Amino acid sequence: MVEDKKTDDYTIEMDKMDQGSKNFEAAAPPPQPRTPPAGSISNNPILPVLAYCGSSILMTVMNKYVLSGLDFNLNFFLLCVQSIVCIVAIQTCKSCGLITYRDFSADEARKWFPITLLLIGMIYTGSKALQFLSIPVYTIFKNLTIILIAYGEVLWFGGSVTGLTLFSFGLMVLSSIIAAWADIKHAVESTGDATAKVSTLNAGYIWMLVNCLCTSSYVLGMRKRIKLTNFKDFDTLAMFYNNLLSIPVLIVLTGLMEDWSSANITRNFPPADRNNIIFAMILSGLSSVFISYTSAWCVRVTSSTTYSMVGALNKLPIALSGLIFFDAPVTFPSVSAIVVGFVSGIVYAVAKIKQNAKPKTGVLPMSNPPVSASSQSMRDSLRS
């Protein structure tokens, strides 16, 4: 499944639930495995970094391509297709012995179902926000979720925020203000119906606000729910249950709340672009799996510190992809917003690294040393 993510930005203390994790790592090797040569391609740190960045850009661009259709309104159906593709992909990987995780358990599914509902809310509102906003603005505003999660940790888990982290939050808010101002300024000054364009942007900002609230609720709720499910292979199991449990819910929602008349289907899937749209929907589902694998690969062959910095730096190419592949306005204010948002991500990553180097006392749980590759990857499958 998509989202948003989210990322890179949500380092959660998993109470060491990731110990013994097998997610997106090769199945247990036979005794006395051979150590790969130092020059092995799979151990080249450049490749996983590029693959991780490419996967993130691919998922965002594919989602925007589908959602930017003239009248696309089958968002629940899009999310359902992505969930089905993700389940097929990870089950195929399990059958081939590439990954391992526990079989389905009704008791675990029952405990995890509330989190799945929060995830559906998160990815649906994220898809609506991305539908109305440009990729650069969407990427910039997504940073605000970090602030909500941080202070949620302060309120409910007894954490604290350092001065450098607080400074990065200020930059995130500033970049969002600049981005909104640049968008509205461009809409007013451009040709056409300025009122309609501003109205569209306002709808996007509202969906983005709701998405930030849903995302923070999902991440904070997931932190508490992990203790109930006792997931050891957390990352793959969370992805498995999230997608599997969401499929019937999304089928019901798309059947009841979306227009399945032949006219609307033709409007959403015009004959000239139908195959491309279907391909993009499938590829966007696969890309969430790619992100999970490549982020785990990145941590395995580099370090958690490198991974944190890559996550921060990755925001720039994602934002730029909106300028390259879509008609996002290229103005001085919009570029300034991207730069400030990019700097805020770097400052936040540096703040996390500094906190990880200090004793754990007085530090937010989300700022403790990053968890294993498997738990790291879950955050990235949430970005959209």
UniProtKB/Swiss-Prot annotation:
Primary localization class, coarse: Golgi
Protein name: GDP-mannose transporter
Keyword Zinc: no
NCBIfam families: nst (TIGR00803)
All ranges on the Cytoplasmic side of the membrane: 1-40, 91-110, 152-160, 222-236, 298-305, 351-384
Membrane topology reported for the UniProt record: Multi-pass membrane protein
Similarity field: Belongs to the TPT transporter family. SLC35D subfamily.
UniProt entry keywords in alphabetical sequence: Cytoplasmic vesicle, Endoplasmic reticulum, Glycoprotein, Golgi apparatus, Membrane, Sugar transport, Transmembrane, Transmembrane helix, Transport
SUPFAM superfamilies: Multidrug resistance efflux transporter EmrE
GO CC annotation: cytoplasmic vesicle membrane; endoplasmic reticulum membrane; Golgi membrane
Bias kind Polar residues: ranges: 369-384
Chain positions carrying an annotated carbohydrate: N264
Domain of life: Eukaryota
Free-text function comment from the UniProt entry: Involved in the import of GDP-mannose from the cytoplasm into the Golgi lumen.
Transmembrane segments: 41-61, 70-90, 111-127, 135-151, 161-182, 201-221, 237-257, 277-297, 306-326, 330-350
Cell compartment(s), UniProt: Golgi apparatus membrane; Cytoplasmic vesicle membrane; Endoplasmic reticulum membrane
Spans annotated as Disordered: 364-384
